[in-house]
């Protein structure tokens, strides 16, 4: 639902009875917002411990990305013991493997390649929220005058930064950053779903499939959970009669076909791994461990991943968890609570 009561793609050139040409401040312009998002995504990471690597994902991404990609083409790994079925390696064929391979070819320092990778994931999330809100019509209607127009533009920036910099990223950013890809792709998926509902053709469904190809492949459960967003969006669009059920069915079928077409390669790989590989989930995390951490209060403040709370002889497995379980605890609950109260008051 757009801010002016209308859903869907809107004509940004539509004005009221007394059109006024507005020159918004730099930070409330679309281009200015993008620069802010990009700066906050990249600059802090580049100045955070330059020259040092975080133990992120697969060590071979930094040691020998070419060999990792070469071996990822086969589900059988004879180098381990007497041979075994690989674990998630096939998912590194795109996009993480090629990125680190290219960085290695051009001679980029590993720490810099890692920071640019993480910054790109964060930037994709923030820019995705900005694009989603503009797709829904935020900032397109100037009828309310300068104050309303700039208020909506500022709201877009705040929403983008709140999503991009949420505590959720602390769970994965320096250990399993590849799991953040579905999170970064969610706002883009929602925007493409809305556009697929409003237009006829395969363009937006095809882009949806390519996006799913990019953000999926390593962790199927993360992608499936994120996929609930577009599904709920389709159902809600039909229930509130924003579009006909025929449109909903058509868009859903096109998106489903595109998703299966681009994702079948890694789905088959994960099925082979589940049937013949090591029972990794039974050895690392079980349902009890996961559910004990994923409580409603922790999910409310954007956390809840079991690994975030781990402790060892050398201290916390993830250092920021110490702050979020001590002095930052009240603040981490207060901010989302204030956001909900503000949304209810609008």
Q: Model features per residue range: what roles?
A:
Residues 7-18, 138-152:
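Intrinsically disordered, low-complexity terminal tails and inter-domain linkers enriched
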Residues 42, 118-136, 152-240, 251-271, ...:
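Membrane-embedded helix bundles of polyisoprenyl
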Residues 106, 136-137, 147, 218:
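A broad structural signal for alpha-helix termini and local helix breaks/kinks
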Residues 244:
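Aromatic-residue-lined binding/catalytic grooves and analogous aromatic/hydrophobic interfacial grooves
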Residues 1-48, 127, 250-251, 255-256, ...:
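Start-transfer (signal-anchor) and selected internal transmembrane alpha helices
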Residues 40-126, 161-184, 288-320:
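Membrane-interface coil-to-helix junctions
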């Amino acid at each position: 639902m757009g801010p002016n009561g209308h859903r869907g793609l809107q004509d940004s050139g539509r004005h009221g009875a007394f059109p006024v040409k507005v020159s918004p401040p730099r930070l409330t312009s679309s281009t200015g917002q993008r620069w802010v998002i990009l700066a906050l995504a990249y600059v802090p990471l580049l100045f955070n411990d330059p020259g040092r690597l975080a133990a992120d994902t697969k060590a071979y991404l930094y040691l020998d990305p070419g060999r990792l990609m070469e071996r990822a083409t086969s589900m059988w790994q004879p180098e381990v013991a007497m041979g075994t079925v690989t674990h998630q390696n096939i998912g590194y064929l795109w996009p993480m493997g090629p990125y680190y391979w290219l960085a290695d070819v051009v001679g980029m320092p590993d720490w810099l390649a890692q920071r640019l990778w993480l910054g790109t994931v964060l930037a994709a999330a923030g820019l995705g929220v900005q694009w989603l809100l503009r797709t829904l019509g935020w900032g397109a209607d100037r009828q309310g005058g300068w104050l309303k127009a700039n208020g909506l533009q500022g709201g877009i920036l705040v929403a983008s930064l709140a999503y991009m910099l949420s505590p959720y990223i602390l769970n994965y950013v320096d250990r399993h950053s590849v799991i953040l890809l579905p999170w970064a792709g969610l706002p883009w998926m929602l925007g493409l779903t809305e556009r697929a509902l409003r237009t006829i053709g395969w363009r937006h469904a095809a882009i949806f499939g390519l996006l799913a190809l990019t953000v999926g492949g390593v962790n199927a459960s993360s992608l499936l959970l994120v996929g609930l967003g577009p599904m709920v969006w389709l159902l809600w669009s039909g229930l509130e009669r924003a579009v006909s059920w025929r449109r909903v069915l058509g868009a859903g079928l096109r998106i489903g076909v595109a998703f299966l077409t681009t994702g079948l390669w890694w789905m088959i790989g994960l099925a082979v791994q589940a049937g013949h590989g090591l029972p990794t989930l039974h050895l690392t995390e079980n349902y009890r461990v996961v559910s004990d951490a994923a409580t409603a209060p922790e999910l409310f403040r954007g956390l809840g991943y079991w690994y975030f709370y781990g402790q060892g002889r050398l201290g916390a497995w993830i250092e920021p968890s110490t702050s979020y379980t001590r002095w930052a605890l009240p603040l981490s609950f207060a901010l989302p609570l204030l956001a909900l109260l503000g949304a209810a008051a609008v």
